[in-house]
UniProtKB/Swiss-Prot annotation:
Pfam families named among the record's database cross-references: 2-ph_phosp
GO MF assignments: 2-phosphosulfolactate phosphatase activity; magnesium ion binding; sulfopyruvate decarboxylase activity
Protein's gene: comB
The EC number(s) this enzyme carries: 3.1.3.71
Family named by the database record: Belongs to the ComB family.
Pathway the protein takes part in: Cofactor biosynthesis; coenzyme M biosynthesis; sulfoacetaldehyde from phosphoenolpyruvate and sulfite: step 2/4
Protein name: 2-phosphosulfolactate phosphatase
Activity regulation annotation text: Inhibited by vanadate.
Source species: Methanocaldococcus jannaschii (strain ATCC 43067 / DSM 2661 / JAL-1 / JCM 10045 / NBRC 100440)
Amino acid sequence: MITLCNRFTEYKCGNVAIVVDVLRASTTITTLLSFIDEVYITTSTSKKENAIYIGERKGRKIEGFDFGNSPTEILANKDIIKERYENGEKVILTTTNGTRVLKSLDAEHIFIGAIVNAKYVAKAVEDFEDVSLVPCHRENNFAIDDFIGCGVIAKYLNGEFDEFIKAALELTKHDWMSLILNSSSAENLKNLGYEKDVTFAILENSIDAVGIYKKDKSKVVRFK
């Protein structure tokens, strides 16, 4: 059964979960895993060690951090990040919603899903019978970008769908890109100067990297 899990802090969604934060944590993590092997996850905004710090609060880069939660900024600085990572520095990420959901979710296998890796994350879970798609939403308010992101991933999944997934799939049959581009999450990012992140985040299947969250080590590692 393929289900949509919204109440991630209150009960176990299922044995296998795909966390979806299109704008932008899932997209940023997937982008990072296209050229490094692991990303540490934290909910803290403090800097405690020599590392590459990436993060935002309410869309804005955290003061003193190396980079914001911006996939296009990450790509623009790919060589710098990769060199520092290969020289032994950890990459540490914190975001308003996505990292909080990862920390609180109770599932045995937690994958990182986005529009940019939709078919690849679906492939990663193809051997599991029951899969929960977990939209992060925006500070506990409904975010249509994450709902549609779940639908885009569900297109590549086989199995019986619950009613929420069916609704998300129905949206993907129409002009779903415009819905995301005009969403409140997208408008907020545009107002902060991150319009390129929004257009990047809707590039379906543009990155073949998939991350899996290792909760005991507080990090996402490249699955494939």
